[in-house]
Amino acid sequence: MGTIQTLPGTRDILPEEIGYWQYVETITTEILSRAMYQEIRAPIFEQTSLFERGIGEATDVVGKEMYTFKDRGDRSVTLRPEGTAGVVRAYLQNNLYATGGVQRLWYQGPMFRYERPQAGRQRQFHQIGLELLGSGDPRADVEVIALATDILKKLGLQSLKLDLNSVGDRNDRQRYREALVNYFLPYKNELDPDSQDRLERNPLRILDSKNQRTKEINQNAPSILQYLGDQSKKHFDQVQQLLTDLNISYQLNPCLVRGLDYYTHTAFEIQSDDLGAQATVCGGGRYDGLVAELGGPDTPAVGWAIGMERLIILLKQRQTVPHCVPDIYIVSKGEQAEAQALILAQKLRFEGLTVELDLSGSAFGKQFKRADRSGAIACIVLGDEEAGTQTLQLKWLATKQQETLDQTQLVSEIGELKAQLARHKQATG
């Protein structure tokens, strides 16, 4: 019997890669905290009806891509395909709207869609997202866009472009939907099969087709910007002006509609040319009707999600993220020395140092080689002699300098040890 493998569309994130993920999470937390966004953690699975009502039954996500099953209570359950619907459900269930004003929330975690796996697209994928609930002000749209660009810039990403569109309100989209159907009907037999199906269910999604012939037909399709009402046009004009005021470059893309039915007014994507076909690294927009659709009060809202897998691909191309290396590597030999080494390691860790304890029990020579490979600044050596006298050997690995110290003194004078470690680290680059 062979070993069990991961399922298609899933992958292990190994220690050699996890530093990139932790780096992204750290930068995101810092930037969003400064803007007063608070983290929220919602369940990974929800009632299926949440996504059917929230995302829209006519979408590809609900119709083709969700992982849905019956649990032992005969409830229809779905692994979340995106984060916004669950956050809105939590916002309502926990009465976060009761205090009035604006709620600024952010989340991170795995999502699930049954898609064809490829670079940057997995069936289990990870997102960082934010939601600003309670404001219909165009400044809210621009705040979330600016935060997304801040995060990506802080991560050192280049070759980024912001695509911007407005999908208007419900009335605007209904007028536009009728215009699209009238435009596409004469081309129906030339459209790809998915677009033919969308013609009746969700014609706006035809604009997002990747099929070459359909893309050619789309070039002359009417623009939704021609069907915006006065209020929608005013909102979109203000968003564009505010982006200009912040020196955030953008380009209008009338074909940008996003894949979820809850979007209203502003829709946007941030893309990178370095990602090939899967160019979008962040996408979002306004969803003023979703809270009411899920049974809550009429509440304007706007948000976005960043695809972590695609972001990590870009980071690997652009920069090296430091991996965790120990400050101190402890080697020991002999029963008493090994017991003291364990105690010493725990004391130093408690004092804030990064310590790796060699547990191999092998000869000192092999342990010293592992200490050199670890990247540690210093090595603590404990043998029978040191164990008997409650001392240790402190060896600076770059200079090979070595000194004998009292074990208790080392811990009690931890500040001096930290200062020495810092000086040696600076001296060795």
UniProtKB/Swiss-Prot annotation:
Its EC number is 6.1.1.21. Its main location: cytoplasm. Coiled coil: none annotated. It is found in: Cytoplasm. It is an enzyme of class 6 (ligase). PANTHER family: HISTIDINE--TRNA LIGASE, MITOCHONDRIAL-RELATED, HISTIDYL-TRNA SYNTHETASE. This is Histidine--tRNA ligase. It comes from Rippkaea orientalis (strain PCC 8801 / RF-1).
